[in-house]
Amino acid sequence: MNSKVGNKNNKRAAGSIGEAAAVQFLKENNYEILETNFRYRRLGEIDIISREKDYICFVEVKARSSLGYGYPREAVNIRKQENIRRLAQIYLCKNRINDLKVRFDVVEVYMEKKGDDIEVKEISLIKNAF
């Protein structure tokens, strides 16, 4: 039972590292970060909301240390996509944003565990992922 708790904490830490790496990657590629971890009630969360030129981008970050469970982008299933779309609509309405094009992206973060450390090996951006 303790190993499961540790495993959850490890996954949470890896997720946080992956999201921080994704934010840095987007900034380096001229994205303006508008918000991270946007939540509305119990509907879920959008990892990153950013702006690139005349687009507002709703970004889902998926991190993996191996491909044993498939490519990170494959974890963004139809249910997750619908949830992100719903939250995006709420964000746009709440912030009265109607002059930007909307795009849904996925950032894949590939990591490697080295002892107690987690190292980011590669980051890829999939524009218009869904």
From Swiss-Prot:
InterPro entries referenced in this protein's UniProt entry, alphabetically: Restrct_endonuc-II-like, tRNA_endonuc-like_dom_sf, UPF0102_YraN-like
GO molecular function, one term: nucleic acid binding
A Pfam family it matches: UPF0102
Database matches in SUPFAM superfamilies: Restriction endonuclease-like
Organism superkingdom: Bacteria
Family per similarity comment: Belongs to the UPF0102 family.
UniProt-listed NCBIfam families: PRK12497.1-3 (NF009150), PRK12497.3-3 (NF009154), YraN family protein (TIGR00252)
Protein name: UPF0102 protein Cthe_0758
Lineage: Bacteria, Bacillati, Bacillota, Clostridia, Eubacteriales
